[in-house]
């Protein structure tokens, strides 16, 4: 499975040609960090949990968003579902990335009473 994960990450890298080499390295670091922190976690289908953040990162990259957004996609469940902290993510990546990760976590906790509210 590691080979498949690495191949899928390399496919993501192909979408990052517009980023600087430094930003591509930061995205790689975020992937490695998330993979390490999600080690042993599985999705309902039995696949490694990291496949979900990696697919989200693909979607974010396809939207043409910046490196911080792609990194936040990779890291979006680390603070909520692992022992990673906001402070640790901020120190390693940036305060912006940590804030984006926190924001995604908070969005998932919003409860809507109607479809109309959800779409706003």
Segments from the language model and where they lie:
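Active-site helical microenvironments for divalent-metal-assisted chemistry
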Residues: 1-120
